[in-house]
A protein has these predicted regions:
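Alpha4 helix (beta4-alpha4-beta5 surface) of REC/receiver domains from two-component response regulators
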Residues: 68, 72, 79, 86, ...
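Active-site residues of response regulator receiver
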Residues: 61-62, 89
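Two-component/phosphorelay signaling modules centered on CheY-like receiver
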Residues: 10, 18-38, 43-44
Length: 138
């Protein structure tokens, strides 16, 4: 898996309020061949950019700056853009996971995460999205 799923030039949006993590994600995704369209720290910015730019992947922290959290942002993005969303969070409590599940996310990674874990989760997210898109066309 991977080589045909993560093709060079796929566009990613990072929505993460911790600067060091956002930079690490930017670096890791770039190494995987992604073009980073933006790294923002609020749900509102993430929604605006995802709606305007229509990325191929969104990495979304759950706790963010601003009035909305990542789950709310993902829900709004999903209503407007068909894009795989991978949550990155330090929160694994039942309530958070249940809220996130309702947005039909494509991946959920607990921080801190390993490089291979990030890559495999992204590969699965892209594959799930491709299968969903194919089913919609049928």
């Amino acid at each position: 898996m991977g080589a045909d799923l993560i093709s060079p030039g796929l566009r990613a949006l990072i929505v993460e309020d911790e600067t060091l993590i956002a930079e690490e994600l930017r670096e890791r995704l770039s190494r995987l061949g992604f073009t980073i369209i933006a790294a923002v720290d609020s749900a509102e910015e993430g929604i605006a950019i995802a709606t305007r730019e229509r990325p191929d992947l969104v990495l979304m922290d759950i706790r963010l700056k601003g009035g909305k959290d990542g789950v709310e942002a993902a829900k709004e993005i999903r209503q407007q853009v068909d894009v795989p969303i991978v949550y990155l969070t330090a929160y694994s409590d039942r309530a958070t996971v249940d809220r996130a599940r309702k947005t039909e996310y494509d991946g959920y990674i607990l921080k801190p995460f390993r490089r291979d874990e990030l890559q495999s989760t992204i590969e699965v997210a892209l594959q799930r999205h491709a299968i969903r898109a194919k089913r919609k066309k049928q």
